[in-house]
Amino acid sequence: MYNHQPENYVCPLCQIAKGEETNHGSQEESVIFRDEFITAFIAGKWWRSNPGHVIIIPNKHIENIYDMPEEIGHKISDFSKKVAIAFKETYKCDGTSTRQHNEPAGNQDVWHYHLHIFPRYTGDNLYLNHQDTYWPSAEEKKPYVNKLKSYML
């Protein structure tokens, strides 16, 4: 509907949904859940005060919320609740936040719908610390993956 992806776009989130390599290597070890409709994984980019945040994507290439089929949107929403509860139980965080961007004016920079779920801690200043990000190693992500996968069983 309101699409902005460039011609010949190679979608990194489609690659993750299919279990393929991305420009940042394989993300398969970061996947905490996958079914025929959605994939959830520990994000590749972290904010230092909020490690282990999760991204949920539709497996089908859907650029933004405007094109989201209701059935898949409901599955993403339902799973985001499971992630939020898992954060509270396993990360012992003080709260959670979700974030989702559409179109360039909405700060979308990957042309595949994705919902971020962040663990929140009192005084973490998540929305003020955009410069305090980094790309964690697979080893650094592993304890978060294991906690969430175990909780989801």
Predicted regions and their residues:
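HIT superfamily nucleotide-processing domains
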Residues: 1-153
